[in-house]
Amino acid sequence: MHCPFCSTEETKVIDSRLVSEGYQVRRRRECGNCHERFTTFETAELIIPKVIKNDGTREPFNEEKLRRGIQHALEKRPVSENDVEKAISYIIHRLRSTGEREVPSKLVGTLVMEELKKLDKVAYIRFASVYLSFDDINQFSKEIEKLRD
């Protein structure tokens, strides 16, 4: 690896540790030329499948779009940012673990609803009302009854 200070290729790893719950390796490196130390992070390159939308079009998975949708449902709800990030990471993990190159948008929506149901029931109903296209109050009532069971 090139030294970020002097650009020489002569660097060595002096310490390695697992971080991010074992999904990343943190390495301390030292340059053999200028003796500066620097840190690198190594992660496995895992491909997130493309999303097949309801109209049949395909688009790359968009983590920001996922985050915005979840945050919008959780607006003014008592859920920590850390819990939101854990939910997003779990959804991405589930998508990767399908082993598929493409997944239907319905799967993404279902995973979001599962996570919101765990985080906050009100946010779940908010998201479900849009995602499932509730037309009237009866659909809200039915979904709320399902939560009570």
Curated annotation (Swiss-Prot):
Residue spans, zinc finger unnamed: 3-34
Keyword rRNA processing: no
Domain of life of the organism encoding this protein: Bacteria
Co-factor(s): Zn(2+)
Cofactor binding comment, as recorded: Binds 1 zinc ion.
Keywords per UniProt: ATP-binding, DNA-binding, Metal-binding, Nucleotide-binding, Repressor, Transcription, Transcription regulation, Zinc, Zinc-finger
Residue ranges occupied by any ATP-cone domain in the UniProt entry: 49-139
PROSITE patterns given in the database record: ATP_CONE
Keyword field contains Cell membrane: no
InterPro entries hit by this protein: ATP-cone_dom, NrdR-like_N, RNR_NrdR-like
GO biological process: negative regulation of DNA-templated transcription
Molecular-function annotations in GO: ATP binding; DNA binding; zinc ion binding
UniProt xrefs under PANTHER family: TRANSCRIPTIONAL REPRESSOR NRDR
HAMAP family in UniProt: NrdR
Function: Negatively regulates transcription of bacterial ribonucleotide reductase nrd genes and operons by binding to NrdR-boxes.
Classification via NCBIfam families: transcriptional regulator NrdR
Record-stated family: Belongs to the NrdR family.
Protein name: Transcriptional repressor NrdR
Organism: Pasteurella multocida (strain Pm70)
Lineage: Bacteria, Pseudomonadati, Pseudomonadota, Gammaproteobacteria, Pasteurellales
Gene behind this protein: nrdR
